Amino acid sequence: MALWIESNGKPLLYAVGRMAMPLFALIFAFNMAKQPGRAQELAKRQWKWAIITQPFFAFAFYDHQPWYALNILLVFAVCSQLVAWIYPRTQYCWIKSILLIAIFAWPLSLASYGLAGIAFVLISVLMLASIAPDKVVLLLWVLSLISLNAASLMTAPIIEVIAFGIIPTLFLPLFMLTLTDSAKATGKRFLPRQTFYWLYCGHLMVLGIVSALLRTWGI
């Protein structure tokens, strides 16, 4: 979503887009960190919704991304599967994990942050799983958050990257950390079950319709 907005020259909308992935990742990481023992069950749900979402994603990004570009839910599916394998130290967990990352890293990099996104989500899970994360984990989290803008750093002026990439990417997620801390204290879910999936599919459908209308009108 963010790359599409950026390519159409709308930096303010692009800035909003940059907030979305870290926000979704923190919500996912918060729920995953609360119940690592259910990681395989959660992974199955992520794979299911990632597959359901892919047609909506292809519709929204028609003419903007190649057909093999993958939606962001597959980042979460990969990460939840990695947690499911590594947390209980299943047999051959590291070999399976490396193969899984190798398979999905490139198609996810086209529109869904690729390795940077996977690293950010996993470090977010590690950070939120701890009552008091140490400074190294916090530093890794901030660095992984900033790395989500690595592609922009290659092509855009540094001032624009800071104003429309790094600051928005940091602002909302850091604000959300305060909310997740309060939710963690009460033991409640941050959002009702499966709300995120419906919202994500819905927003892709809206983007696809808007894009189709713009193509029809020649805009």
Predicted feature residues:
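Alpha-helical transmembrane segments and their immediate juxtamembrane cytosolic regions
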Residues: M1-I219
